[in-house]
Amino acid sequence: MDSLTKSINQFALEFSKKLAESAEGKNIFFSPWGISTSLAMVYLGTRGTTAAQIAQVLQFNRDQDSKFFPESEKKRKMDFNSRKVEEIRSDFQTLISEINNPSNAYVLKTANGIYGEKTYPFHNKYLEDMKTYFGVEPQSVNFLEAPDQTRNEINSWVESQTQGKILNLLPDDAVDSATRMVLVNAIYFKGIWEHQFSARDTREKPFRINKNTSKPVQMMSMKKKLQVFHIENPQAIGLQLYYESRDLSLFLLLPEDVSGLDQLEKAVTYEKLSEWTSADMMELYDVQLHLPKFKLEESYDLKSALSSMGMSDAFNQSKADFSGMSVEGNLFLSNVFHKSFVEINEQGTEASAGTGSEVSLRIRLPSIEFNADHPFLFFIRHNKTNSILFYGRFCSP
């Protein structure tokens, strides 16, 4: 399962950089775990070059060849079984079970769906595999004759799966009578901090968007013993905030310079992030933390981003090979829609009752101020599996 976690985390960084190309000055927030899971479901129904391209984008082969580049023809022509399908399926099954464990001290509601035009019926074997390994039942729907009704039904299902937090995933023009297959992924997350902020300490303070512009935010504050790590190139500081039971952590990566976010984003690699956030790099400090309250709800039509990353054949009617999914030819992926919701406040990711405890340490710790009053990167990690569930940047209140 370690190789799957590595693939998901590598995808997180590559995908964030792709989104950043067309989102200058904008917030970014997505779930690499959610997108990887939904694309893996599609991958298992593809063959040939279509499968090889998806494997490339999802980083399934990267651990076998650290020198591969997106343009590598060798990778494009890789056989579907370059990494055993059984391994991918069972790894996802294990990871899904770990992350969605009902004993976890957080709520993670995921809506994963594959919707295919009913004149392109799914293979029974594919339907069985999706239910067994992913807990998902692909749906045959009537895009051809009732696209609007189908869109509303999909949106209603997503809304119910995410406890009403994610609405209208598919916009008005998302599907039409020519739509053949749509992939949807929406995630709602709710967690409680191990150490909660006191609302009495929250004040309106300026958030410096750049050296010349600032906006007021509600800035939370607390002084606690927290894990901190230092980044030398580029100059930045990182901090780990545990959620209750320490199943999950929020990591903040704050550039030293107000305008240093772009440089930090470009510098982040899987290897560097693993090094920075390793236990060896963490030091316990008495931290005076200032963190803005914020709510992010970002929607993405992933077709263009995924195509430009190398996964183009799946969206091309004349090239797509979904023979592992349906007996009908000409089936192709019309669109991929993803939406994630997060709210960072005094209690955690959504207001809820809860108490935090603190370990009492008699040794005197060095003091440090962590003032997130300018653009920063953040991600939420599932600690047992080391998987990045959510990744984002906050630069525009």
Curated annotation (Swiss-Prot):
Its recorded name reads Serpin B10
Residue numbers marked as site, Reactive bond? 362-363
Sorted keywords for this record are: Cytoplasm, Nucleus, Protease inhibitor, Serine protease inhibitor
Compartment list:
Nucleus; Cytoplasm
Provide the GO MF annotations for this entry.
Answer: serine-type endopeptidase inhibitor activity
- One Pfam entry for this protein is Serpin
Q: Which InterPro entries does this entry report, sorted A to Z?
A: Serpin_CS (IPR023795), Serpin_dom (IPR023796), Serpin_fam (IPR000215), Serpin_sf (IPR036186), Serpin_sf_1 (IPR042178), Serpin_sf_2 (IPR042185)
Q: Which cysteines are joined by disulfide bonds?
A: none
* Organism (species): Rhinolophus ferrumequinum
Q: What is known about what this protein does?
A: Protease inhibitor that may play a role in the regulation of protease activities during hematopoiesis and apoptosis induced by TNF. May regulate protease activities in the cytoplasm and in the nucleus.
Chief subcellular site? Answer: nucleus
User: What's the family?
Assistant: Belongs to the serpin family. Ov-serpin subfamily.
| Organism phylogeny | Eukaryota, Metazoa, Chordata, Craniata, Vertebrata
Query: Organism's domain of life?
Result: Eukaryota
| Motif range (Nuclear localization signal) | 74-77
A GO-annotated cellular component: cytoplasm
Query: What gene codes for this chain?
Result: SERPINB10
